[in-house]
Regions:
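Bacterial N-terminal signal peptides that target proteins for export
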Residues: 1-10
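Boundary at the C-terminal end of the N-terminal hydrophobic targeting segment
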Residues: 21-23
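Beta-propeller-forming repeat regions
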Residues: 25-304
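Bacterial N-terminal signal peptides
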Residues: 10-19
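Intrinsically disordered, low-complexity regions enriched in Ser/Pro/Gly/Gln/His and often acidic
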Residues: 2-3, 15, 251
Length: 304
């Protein structure tokens, strides 16, 4: 499935969009104790933001805004030295400890400062992760790696063809670049899935972005199972300069995978970095192997 949009979802996100969508319900405002929560691990493991709580296999967003709600969340989840499992490759890879809450501080949003202690993961640049207090299935092994040279070659042929199909010139396709390309195994079956974020620069005032999930079959053939193409021009960007997208702002990027509903298939968590906050998305594999977006929320930080 391929979608094309003129104005990307993540550049002009409204900061009022703090509740979940796709039939998910807001998390209850009162609680006797911490509920299972999934966090995005950002800035090299030095900061977290909440993505959703988990209840009966469903995701729900927290509503921030009222001071009492914000303080309640911080007291439940952001107490100094509180510890969470750090998820990398769909399995636990060390821990993440809270240093201090940023809720109520200038541009702190719903975040907290953290310290990560990983086993294998190297959280640098746009390599991010998840953290959670949910019960983790310790019987499944972590799987997250860079694609092989052959795999990358096959994927980039698909990416180039998709950009051309969407109307990009041959010269523009030659400017092919990426922010992320990662191999994962969502079903623990030894057949990798690939999550990628590619872009081209047809002109100095235009960028074209492609986010995708690709599959590899038993014969080694790779094909897209989901992709989203966006055309971005200066008027679509809050800063008015498309070059700001070259750093990763405005792109949908992988966080990690986690089987939050215990159905044996890891869901894919992504982030869309915007100028005033972050968009978060979750994809779930359905019948027939198709991927669909089952959850979406926005975390406002401060005005641009």
């Amino acid at each position: 499935m391929t979608n094309t949009t003129k104005t990307p979802w993540l550049i002009v996100a409204a900061f009022l969009f703090t509740a979940s969508v796709y039939g998910q319900k807001p998390a209850p405002k009162s609680s006797a104790g911490p509920k299972p929560v999934i966090f995005a691990v950002l800035d090299g493991g030095k900061r977290v933001e909440p993505i959703a709580s988990v209840s009966a296999g469903k995701l729900a967003a927290y509503e921030f805004g009222e001071e009492v709600q914000n303080k309640a969340f911080a007291s439940l989840y952001y107490k100094p030295k509180s510890s969470y499992s750090l998820i990398f490759g769909g399995a636990a890879d060390g821990t993440l400890a809270i240093v201090k809450s940023n809720i109520g501080t200038e541009c702190g949003g719903a975040s907290a400062d953290t310290v990560s202690r990983t086993v294998k993961a190297k959280l640098t640049g746009l390599v991010m992760a998840l953290a959670t207090n949910t019960k983790i299935n310790t019987s499944t092994a972590a799987y997250r790696r860079k694609p092989s040279v052959e795999e990358r070659r096959g994927i980039e042929k698909l990416v180039s063809a998709e950009f051309a199909k969407q109307g990009a010139s041959a010269a523009a396709v030659k400017t092919l670049r990426y922010h992320n390309l990662t191999a994962l195994d969502v079903e623990d079956d030894g057949q990798p899935e690939f999550i990628g974020s590619y872009w081209i620069a047809p002109t100095s005032g235009e960028r074209r972005l492609l986010f995708f999930i690709a599959e590899q079959d038993a014969n080694g053939k790779i094909q897209f199972s989901m992709s989203e193409h966006s055309v971005v021009k200066a008027d679509d960007v809050m800063s008015g300069d498309v070059k700001d997208l070259d750093t990763g702002v405005g792109h949908e990027l992988l966080l990690d995978v986690l089987d939050y509903d215990a159905d044996g298939v890891r869901e894919i968590f992504t982030i869309g970095r915007a100028f005033e906050g972050n968009n978060y998305y979750v994809y779930k594999r359905g019948e027939g192997g198709n991927w669909s977006k089952v959850y979406e929320t926005y975390s406002y930080r401060c005005a641009f």
